[in-house]
Amino acid sequence: MMRYPEHADPVITLTAGPVNAYPEVLRGLGRTVLYDYDPAFQLLYEKVVDKAQKAMRLSNKPVILHGEPVLGLEAAAASLISPDDVVLNLASGVYGKGFGYWAKRYSPHLLEIEVPYNEAIDPQAVADMLKAHPEITVVSVCHHDTPSGTINPIDAIGALVSAHGAYLIVDAVSSFGGMKTHPEDCKADIYVTGPNKCLGAPPGLTMMGVSERAWAKMKANPLAPRASMLSIVDWENAWSRDKPFPFTPSVSEINGLDVALDLYLNEGPEAVWARHALTAKAMRAGVTAMGLSVWAASDSIASPTTTAVRTPDGVDEKALRQAARARYGVVFSSGRGETLGKLTRIGHMGPTAQPIYAIAALTALGGAMNAAGRKLAIGKGIEAALAVIDADA
């Protein structure tokens, strides 16, 4: 049965990103495209940076780079890491592992702690590595690795790195805005996120917190990109209406970010985090009651923004997702890299971080499993999810 053919738009997108954008954000994207040196746009840009600073709870101005957050992550490696740095990369998933490849490009001295991709980094292992290698100068970690649906204890890790005197790079692309995390909470020197996950805006921008000592290190690094898309230092003062932009900013994306930040701040960050957490909790309860299992090794490290569901033996994961889309109009994400074919990722970020979407996801997932010959107790899954939701009412 193909009620929703591939060429037709899906009914609901429940992926790990890009995610559905809020309708208000989409309307914001449709605002007039202003000349970037028009005083009205320069004032808007300054206000958007101020809103980002408030949302990120920073004591200094954040940086906005004009490309989706992978640009920001690579820029962080290129700008902060110099050839004499010793980098410790913490890998608990595909994206954490991937940052190590960038780090290796800019310094030959790479150490790594890697754990199975359904587990989290143990702060004690970080402490032991820092003690064994006092020469470590930079540590990198992915907070939420979406291909695993797991989160790392970055506040504890950050405290250890700070005490050691090393610089900390944090990938918070799919965690910021969906749970309590801020650059200064985890003592990050470069903290990379974006609007295209939990803030419910399209991909196209990077938001970055940069510590004062990271600014100093990047400026002193002769190999840090300048006059380049990968440059961070070129954008240091771009927030000020009195300073020129290094190149044309993404005007429409700034319009969208302006609205996304207003929505986040007006709803209240704690309220936003709470609905992400409730949706994820309902999702996990339903998955388990239905007879499936969550990929994360324990509930304590399971993400509140993406639930990774283990694919049962004998089930074709790609066919499963295709069935969910064709039969129910619901789109899920696959795994990536080592987790490809082993799990299905169900995103609940931004506008879809609402408990009712857990019910929709369980229905589509269970129905697709049944179509694959795995008869699941869909009703029990929905009942379990509703019990979680109703208990919070």
From Swiss-Prot:
| Alphabetized GO MF terms | alanine-glyoxylate transaminase activity; L-serine-pyruvate transaminase activity; pyridoxal phosphate binding; pyridoxamine-pyruvate transaminase activity; transaminase activity
Which GO terms of type biological process are on file?
A: glycine biosynthetic process, by transamination of glyoxylate
Keyword list, A-Z = Aminotransferase, Chloride, Pyridoxal phosphate, Transferase
Output the superkingdom of the source species: Bacteria
Q: How is activity modulated by pH?
A: Optimum pH is 9.5.
Please provide an example of a Pfam family that matches this protein in its UniProt record: Aminotran_5
**UniProt enzyme class:** transferase
Q: What is this protein's function?
A: Catalyzes a reversible transamination reaction between pyridoxamine and pyruvate to form pyridoxal and L-alanine.
Q: NCBIfam families from the xrefs?
A: PyrdoxPyrvTramin
Designated name of the protein: Pyridoxamine--pyruvate transaminase
Q: Which gene encodes it?
A: ppaT
